[in-house]
């Protein structure tokens, strides 16, 4: 659904990981923080988060802009739209709201779409960047009130 970058471990952390693997040490003190029923309940609660028509139209317009962008080989698919919709609902839920705001959508455009879009050869040669293009496209779409 999303592509996030968490970076690399520090030199020390990476060496410790390698040494623990060589020594056959496994993490044994892992305990669950949530059970299956709770996951299913949260999933249903996220699906119940309201997306007003104008916010849905805002999402669709952003998706459509990717299809018109010459720097992309092909624009975002309808499934990308659905992923943006679900991710926005989850963000709203985690923020303690039962409705999606345009800011939720804006915050997730990069994480949801960046791995779904491929730059053209010309764009790559011109040192274009998917995230910068997405930011530019989002600024071209009127934010609903």
Residue ranges: model-predicted function:
Residues 1-49, 53-61:
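Conserved AAA+ ATPase core "coupling" helix
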Residues 66-145:
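C-terminal engagement/docking regions of AAA+ P-loop ATPases
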């Amino acid at each position: 659904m999303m592509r996030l970058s968490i970076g690399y471990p520090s030199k020390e952390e990476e060496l410790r990981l390698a040494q623990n693997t060589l020594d056959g040490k496994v993490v044994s003190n892992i305990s669950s923080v949530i059970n299956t029923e709770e996951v299913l309940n949260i999933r249903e609660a996220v699906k119940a988060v309201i997306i007003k028509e104008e916010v849905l139209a805002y999402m669709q317009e952003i998706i459509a802009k990717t299809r018109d962008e010459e720097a992309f080989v092909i624009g975002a698919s309808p499934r990308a739209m659905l992923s943006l919709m679900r991710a926005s609902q989850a963000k709203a839920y985690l923020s303690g709201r039962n409705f999606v705001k345009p800011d939720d959508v804006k915050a997730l455009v990069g994480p949801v779409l960046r791995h779904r879009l491929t730059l053209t050869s010309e764009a790559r040669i011109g040192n274009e960047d998917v995230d910068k293009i997405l930011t530019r496209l989002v600024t071209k779409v009127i934010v609903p009130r």
